[in-house]
């Protein structure tokens, strides 16, 4: 990485809520630090069955008018937008089909929280909230696994063929010389 920085991650547990915060310090006296940062929480799914069609659901907040970009070549994305696969109740199934093209990337501050539900569509597992502009949700492609990753990001995966400087990447963060930037990566409220 071409910049010096100090990263501090803190976790706090209060009741049933686990909070993850990050501080990014720029030790330089002269250079602006350009960076992206995100979390990588994975949630185990209690109804995992490798032979099931759907092993749980996700309820985004808000859940109307959503669209995503999809990861493709080496985790990069193209410019096309796609409809979010949702049930009539506005739930996103956790299935091989949903993640057939790897990640669902909600950008533009579309989703500020995601509740994970058991396969019965009623029982809440947990609710992840965040303040990041991007929420990336993924599971392994072509194979159900016993978890789903719900990742808030202050930044965005690269576009296919990307050749733009770090300072003008979508949702890039910038710390001025000597500055410490604070980010709430996520809060997870456990419901089970």
Indicate where each model-derived feature is located.
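Beta-strand-rich interaction surfaces with strong enrichment in secreted/lumenal proteins
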Residues: 8-10, 169-176
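Short, structured beta-strand/loop micro-motifs enriched in basic residues and often containing a Trp
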Residues: 160-168
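Beta-strand elements of well-folded, non-transmembrane domains
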Residues: 13-15, 24-28, 41-45, 62, ...
């Amino acid at each position: 990485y071409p910049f010096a920085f100090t990263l501090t991650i803190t976790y706090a547990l209060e009741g049933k809520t686990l909070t993850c915060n990050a501080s990014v310090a720029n030790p330089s006296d002269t250079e602006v630090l350009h960076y992206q940062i995100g979390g990588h929480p994975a949630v185990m799914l209690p109804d995992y069955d490798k032979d099931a069609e759907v092993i749980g659901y996700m309820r985004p907040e808000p859940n109307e008018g959503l669209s995503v970009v999809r990861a493709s070549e080496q985790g990069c994305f193209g410019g096309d937008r796609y409809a979010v696969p949702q049930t009539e109740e506005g739930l996103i199934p956790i299935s091989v089909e949903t993640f057939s093209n790897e990640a669902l990337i909600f950008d533009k501050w579309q989703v500020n929280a995601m509740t994970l539900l058991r396969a019965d569509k009623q029982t809440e597992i947990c609710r992840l909230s965040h303040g990041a502009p991007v929420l990336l949700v993924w599971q392994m492609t072509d194979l159900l696994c016993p978890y789903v990753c719900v990742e808030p990001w202050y930044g965005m995966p690269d576009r296919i063929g990307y050749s733009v400087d770090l300072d003008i990447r979508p949702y890039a963060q910038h710390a001025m010389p000597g500055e410490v930037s604070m980010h709430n990566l996520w809060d997870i409220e456990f419901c089970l």
